[in-house]
From Swiss-Prot:
Optimum temperature is 40-45 degrees Celsius. Glucuronyl hydrolase involved in ulvan degradation. Ulvan is the main polysaccharide component of the Ulvales (green seaweed) cell wall. It is composed of disaccharide building blocks comprising 3-sulfated rhamnose (Rha3S) linked to D-glucuronic acid (GlcA), L-iduronic acid (IduA), or D-xylose (Xyl). Belongs to the glycosyl hydrolase 105 family. One of its GO terms (molecular function) is hydrolase activity. The lineage of its organism: Bacteria, Pseudomonadati, Bacteroidota, Flavobacteriia, Flavobacteriales. It holds the Pfam family Glyco_hydro_88. The keyword Disulfide bond does not apply. This is Unsaturated 3S-rhamnoglycuronyl hydrolase. Its EC number is 3.2.1.-. It is found in: Cell membrane. A lipid is attached at C17 (N-palmitoyl cysteine). GO terms for cellular component: plasma membrane. Its main location: membrane. Homotrimer.
Length: 377
């Protein structure tokens, strides 16, 4: 993922969401059903009126955004969400983006699959482009699979960066479910395990973003100023958020389901341990002082995943205060016009955000979180 135009971040903007100029929410019940639904719709309306993407309307940024829109519709049944989903699917001609080897470029198909599952009109949806992408992505050779694409990120496995575990596996899983072709799920598991074995730190129970941040025990290891390993909040949010989406649709009797349940629980326990007091995770999970202000996209993915686990009974109620604290802090990061601020720009490692910085995937993460907070009331 290449960076788009960087938002200007000044020293004056580096403070927590809870200290913004926005009117504090202490007097409002941010857990009131109407308040949550209104906040979510305002976020949708603002984002639809201010489209943004990295390289194309079908890229991963919109993939993550419209995944949030789909889950918001799933919970609320508000047709404004479905209208947005259908409009973009038709405008995109139901196409993923063009790089068939790249997990990022099929993330948009989660929204297509969701529309197809919920649309009563025959022949409205066209999932053939998604099938073509998945068949090529999973079953045909490319330089990454062959291990010949040597680079600083070590692009020698298909999903060499942890973000990929949000982008492709939930789509593959949902397609396998809808098409009744479980063999797709087995292929997904094969590539998921490659990423897990390379990037998951079993001691820290967190994922390195890519091979650059994996410790080998030498002087070349990347460290934070405090000497800790570099673990990116949004990167781990991609993973645990993707796990929630994956487990949502994975068959209960799938032979590898226990692996994903256990990984989810391990990560959830670690994410809970390192939550800052104000509720929002910092962009650097083990060095919060590096950028000592909350960041919404990673925090929203964490909140979505934890709330989902509580609602499904996978984790117990001890997580509830943390989820509520995070949601309250995120609510204070939403501008009055609906824009979701304090979102780190496109990147691959911890960097600062500001109260005015936004991205469509940050809005999508906010909608994901809200969709599960609504069920917790």
């Amino acid at each position: 993922m290449n960076k788009s135009i960087l938002l200007l971040v000044t020293l004056l903007s580096l403070y927590s969401c809870t200290d913004t100029e926005k009117t504090p929410l202490e007097e409002k019940d941010v857990f009131n059903e109407d308040y949550i639904k209104t906040s979510m719709i305002k976020a949708l309306e603002w984002q639809e009126a201010h489209p943004i993407f990295a390289i194309h309307p079908t890229d991963w940024t919109n993939g993550a955004y419209y995944t949030g829109v789909a889950r918001a519709h799933h919970t609320t049944k508000n047709m404004m969400y479905m209208a947005a989903l259908k409009n973009q699917a038709v405008a995109n001609n139901w196409q993923p983006y063009t790089r068939l080897y790249h997990a990022d470029d099929v993330a948009i198909s989660y929204s297509y699959l969701y529309v197809a599952e919920n649309e009563k009109r025959r022949n409205f949806s066209d999932l053939e482009p998604t099938k073509k992408f998945l068949d090529t992505h999973l079953y045909e050779d490319n330089a990454w699979k062959a291990g010949t694409n040597r680079s600083k990120e070590d692009k020698t496995i298909l999903w060499w960066w942890c973000d990929a575990l949000f982008m492709a596996p939930p789509v593959i899983n949902l397609y396998a479910k809808q098409s009744e072709q479980p063999e797709y799920l087995d292929e997904m598991h094969k590539y998921y395990m490659e990423t897990y074995n390379r990037l998951y730190d079993k001691e820290e129970k967190l994922f390195a973003r890519d091979s650059r941040f994996v410790w080998d025990g030498d002087d070349e290891d990347k460290k934070e100023p405090n000497g800790e390993k570099v673990f990116w909040s949004r990167g781990n949010g991609w993973v645990i958020g993707g796990l929630a989406l994956l487990l949502e649709d994975m068959p209960e009797d799938y032979k590898h389901r226990d692996f994903y349940v256990n990984l989810y629980k391990e990560m959830a326990s670690r994410i809970l341990e390192i939550q800052p007091e104000d509720g929002l995770w910092r962009t650097s999970l083990l060095s919060p002082e590096s950028y000592d202000h909350g960041e919404v996209s990673g925090s929203a993915f964490h909140t979505f995943a934890l709330a989902w686990g509580i609602n499904k009974g996978l984790i117990d109620k001890k997580y509830t205060p943390a989820v509520k604290k995070a949601w309250k802090a995120m609510a204070n990061c939403q501008h009055d016009d609906g824009r979701v601020g304090w979102v780190q720009n496109i990147g691959a490692f911890p960097e600062p955000a500001s109260k005015d910085s936004y991205q469509n995937f940050g809005t999508g993460a906010f909608l994901l979180a809200g969709s599960e907070i609504l069920k917790m009331r």
